[in-house]
């Protein structure tokens, strides 16, 4: 039997993407949802907790240093330069998380916040490199699968930093929880160090003396303003909800252990399942069909919050509601991220992916920062009703998107 080296390379690259995606999800939650529980137990109100999402504002501007990172990553060190950038970004994230644990948010508010911003900064660099790895290592026909792998690794990181951290917080201090989370990133770091990178297109690592053309290349694409608007609005529902579901579940009587198992662990499994199904469906159906259906299903999931609020608050109902919410969320992500990759040119992948994800992050920061105000002044009923209608702008824009923006 002949050994199929190309298939082995493809599978190993998928596995590599999955493993290095783990720290991305873990660190993402440490500055988001998990942080909200720490702040809540430290005595902060919903409005202040919502405003803490502004620490991730740095993600909005990552496209500004994307070209510099692109030049450093690929020339003159080529694959080694790319690997060095991954290592430096991840090591910096780990160190900043560890430094964060030396501060109490009540007594050392400013240094605590500054450390969070530093974590977000290095996390944004790591995310850019992580997302571009799919374009560098995987052929475009398999981006749906690679995105499912990336989402799975990311979601596992979220699971550990969510369910695992929440459960640990009932046993040890939040400072020790965050130290434990930082240590868990080390296996991914070791894999990055030892894994032999093999880019599918060697032209990617040549001649970036005029890297600013990445922006010009993007605005030459058909209907680029509609693409930008779509990236801004697609995740409007999730961004509006932000970290408020954490507060909602606590307010209606669920304990941290209930949420660790039901909301975080079970919900993450549902999201991973949705992500994989979405990834495989990308190979069978066109993107716009999936994007529309996923948006509608996910919008309906807002009703599950109201079901818990008005009718039933037992554990079984929590699991049903969480499955609906998280499965549909996972279903929306694979076609969305895969379409993002199709909007980028391979030779400018880091800069253009940074630009697109920065645009998407504007919505995350803007609506996440006001979610606390909205939940406080609207009340839970109207808050979740408004969230349910947030899919409409993106749904309308899908009709006007260019069908396929194939990377050059």
UniProtKB/Swiss-Prot annotation:
The chain crosses the membrane at residues 10-30, 49-69, 84-104, 109-129, 154-174, 177-197, 224-244, 261-281, 294-311, 315-337, 353-373, 378-398. It is found in: Cell inner membrane. It comes from the Bacteria. It is a multi-pass membrane protein. Disulfide bonds: none annotated. The keyword Acetylation does not apply. Its main location: membrane. PANTHER family: MAJOR FACILITATOR SUPERFAMILY DOMAIN-CONTAINING PROTEIN 3, SOLUTE CARRIER FAMILY 33 ACETYL-COA TRANSPORTER -RELATED. Belongs to the major facilitator superfamily. This is Putative transporter AmpG 2. It comes from Rickettsia felis (strain ATCC VR-1525 / URRWXCal2).
């Amino acid at each position: 039997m002949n050994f199929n080296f190309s298939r082995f390379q493809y599978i190993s690259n998928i596995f590599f993407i999955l493993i290095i995606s783990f720290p991305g999800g873990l660190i993402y939650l440490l500055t988001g949802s998990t942080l909200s529980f720490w702040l809540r137990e430290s005595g902060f109100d919903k409005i202040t907790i919502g405003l803490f999402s502004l620490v991730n504002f740095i993600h909005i501007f990552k496209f500004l240093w994307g070209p510099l990172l692109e030049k450093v990553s690929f020339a003159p060190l080529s694959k080694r330069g790319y690997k060095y950038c991954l290592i430096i970004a991840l090591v910096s994230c780990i160190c900043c998380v560890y430094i964060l644990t030396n501060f109490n948010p009540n007594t050392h508010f400013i240094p605590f916040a500054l450390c969070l911003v530093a974590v977000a900064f290095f996390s944004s660099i790591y995310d850019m490199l992580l997302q571009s790895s799919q374009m560098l290592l995987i052929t475009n026909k398999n981006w749906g699968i690679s995105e499912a792998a990336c989402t799975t690794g990311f979601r596992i990181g979220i699971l550990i930093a969510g369910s695992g951290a929440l459960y640990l917080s009932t046993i040890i201090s939040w400072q020790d929880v965050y130290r434990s989370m930082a240590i868990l990133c080390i296996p991914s770091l070791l894999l990055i160090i030892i894994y032999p990178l093999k880019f599918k297109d060697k032209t990617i690592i040549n001649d970036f003396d005029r890297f600013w053309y990445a922006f010009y290349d993007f605005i030459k694409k058909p209907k680029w303003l509609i693409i930008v608007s779509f990236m801004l609005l697609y995740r409007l529902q999730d961004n509006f909800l932000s970290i408020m579901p954490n507060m909602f579940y606590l307010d209606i009587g669920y304990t941290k252990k209930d949420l660790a198992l039901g909301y975080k662990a079970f919900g993450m499994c549902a999201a991973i399942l949705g992500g994989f199904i979405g990834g495989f469906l990308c190979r069978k159906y066109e993107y716009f069909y999936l994007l529309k259906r996923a948006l509608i299903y996910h919008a309906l999931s807002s009703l599950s919050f109201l079901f818990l609020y008005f009718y039933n608050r037992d554990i079984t109902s929590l699991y049903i509601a969480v499955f609906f919410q998280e499965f549909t969320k996972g279903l929306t992500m694979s076609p969305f991220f895969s379409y993002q990759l199709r909007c980028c040119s391979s030779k400018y992948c880091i800069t253009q992916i940074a630009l697109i994800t920065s645009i998407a992050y504007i919505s995350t920061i803007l609506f996440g920062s006001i979610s606390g105000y909205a939940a406080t002044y609207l009340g839970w009923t109207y808050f979740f009703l408004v969230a349910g209608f947030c899919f409409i702008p993106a749904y309308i824009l899908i009709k006007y998107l260019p069908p396929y923006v194939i990377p050059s």
